[in-house]
Amino acid sequence: MIQQETRLKVADNSGAREILTIKVLGGSGHKFANIGDVIVASVKQATPGGAVKKGDVVKAVIVRTKTGARRPDGSYIKFDDNAAVIIRDDKTPRGTRIFGPVARELREGGYMKIVSLAPEVL
């Protein structure tokens, strides 16, 4: 579960390395974010020469969580880290590459570009 002030790894080549969650989008009662949810975040670490700089406020979609997500068949999917991909307003990623596996739940959320760029979909 990702909440306010949670730090996440960035799983793309947009230039950011680490982001800090400012707000979970999705209504007033939405306190925690899971896989496929959109957050507003601040860039805390960035690589030089990247598209985003340290201090930028960006939107990102969660692609991996340590807590994991429950599937309709009763199984759970868990990852080793909490990671997100920085997106534009039209749900397309800012970067051109995705690093590491992503969850299948992104397909139902309409993030087909992220799913197609990912090296592995679990």
UniProtKB/Swiss-Prot annotation:
<dbReference type="GO" id="GO:0006412">
    <property type="term" value="P:translation"/>
</dbReference>
<keyword id="KW-0687">Ribonucleoprotein</keyword>
<comment type="similarity">
    <text>Belongs to the universal ribosomal protein uL14 family.</text>
</comment>
<dbReference type="Pfam" id="PF00238">
    <property type="entry name" value="Ribosomal_L14"/>
</dbReference>
<dbReference type="GO" id="GO:0070180">
    <property type="term" value="F:large ribosomal subunit rRNA binding"/>
</dbReference>
<dbReference type="InterPro" id="IPR019972">
    <property type="entry name" value="Ribosomal_uL14_CS"/>
</dbReference>
<comment type="function">
    <text>Binds to 23S rRNA. Forms part of two intersubunit bridges in the 70S ribosome.</text>
</comment>
<dbReference type="InterPro" id="IPR005745">
    <property type="entry name" value="Ribosomal_uL14_bac-type"/>
</dbReference>
<protein>
    <recommendedName>
        <fullName>Large ribosomal subunit protein uL14</fullName>
    </recommendedName>
</protein>
<dbReference type="InterPro" id="IPR000218">
    <property type="entry name" value="Ribosomal_uL14"/>
</dbReference>
<dbReference type="GO" id="GO:0003735">
    <property type="term" value="F:structural constituent of ribosome"/>
</dbReference>
<comment type="subunit">
    <text>Part of the 50S ribosomal subunit. Forms a cluster with proteins L3 and L19. In the 70S ribosome, L14 and L19 interact and together make contacts with the 16S rRNA in bridges B5 and B8.</text>
</comment>
<dbReference type="InterPro" id="IPR036853">
    <property type="entry name" value="Ribosomal_uL14_sf"/>
</dbReference>
<keyword id="KW-0699">rRNA-binding</keyword>
<keyword id="KW-0694">RNA-binding</keyword>
<keyword id="KW-0689">Ribosomal protein</keyword>
<dbReference type="GO" id="GO:0022625">
    <property type="term" value="C:cytosolic large ribosomal subunit"/>
</dbReference>
